[in-house]
A protein has these predicted regions:
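N-terminal Rossmann-like NAD(P)+-binding domain of SDR-like oxidoreductases, especially those catalyzing
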Residues: 1-166
């Protein structure tokens, strides 16, 4: 039996590298890893060609343009555009190449600024987002909705999880 081929987009980041370490310990999977220089996730053709040639079975989507408050305030268009492109390119290419399992890493910033604590999943889209990272949050919400839409329309198993700082 061949090993499952798992692509980790963002394997050098904090969450992606933790996922990589856990999967490496299993030993029953083959990890497919590409650096930013090896695969430009903003290039839809490159992402599609990568998926078409690599026979990927599962995807962990941890890649994102991230930054602090100053970066988010200074480059809001870059944050929303680049994150939506990364998510759209990977999710669509995964679907086109019959990858049925995908895990999208969201962010706790998708919850409203004044959400009750502890936050409940039902708080999503129920209030105003924190203005300092709203474009990033909107891109992350778009990724969640992309996963939900591919599941509903195509019967995929694309899931979203929100991490926090606990």
């Amino acid at each position: 039996m061949s090993k499952q081929r798992i692509f980790i987009a963002g394997h050098r980041g904090m969450v992606g590298s933790a996922i990589r370490r856990q999967l490496e310990q299993r030993g029953d999977v083959e990890l497919v890893l590409r650096t930013r220089d090896e695969l430009n996730l903003l290039d839809s053709r490159a992402v599609h060609d990568f998926f078409a040639s690599e026979s990927i079975d599962q995807v962990y989507l941890a890649a994102a343009k991230v930054g602090g408050i100053v970066a988010n305030n200074t480059y809001p268009a870059d944050f929303i555009y680049q994150n939506m492109m990364i998510e759209s390119n990977i999710i669509h290419a995964a679907h086109q190449n019959d990858v049925n399992k995908l895990l999208f890493l969201g962010s706790s910033c998708i919850y409203p600024k004044l959400a009750k604590q502890p936050m409940a999943e039902s708080e999503l889209l129920q209030g105003t987002l924190e203005p300092t990272n709203e474009p990033y949050a909107i891109a992350k919400i778009a990724g969640i909705k992309l996963c939900e839409s591919y599941n509903r329309q195509y019967g995929r198993d694309y899931r979203s999880v929100m991490t926090d700082n606990w």
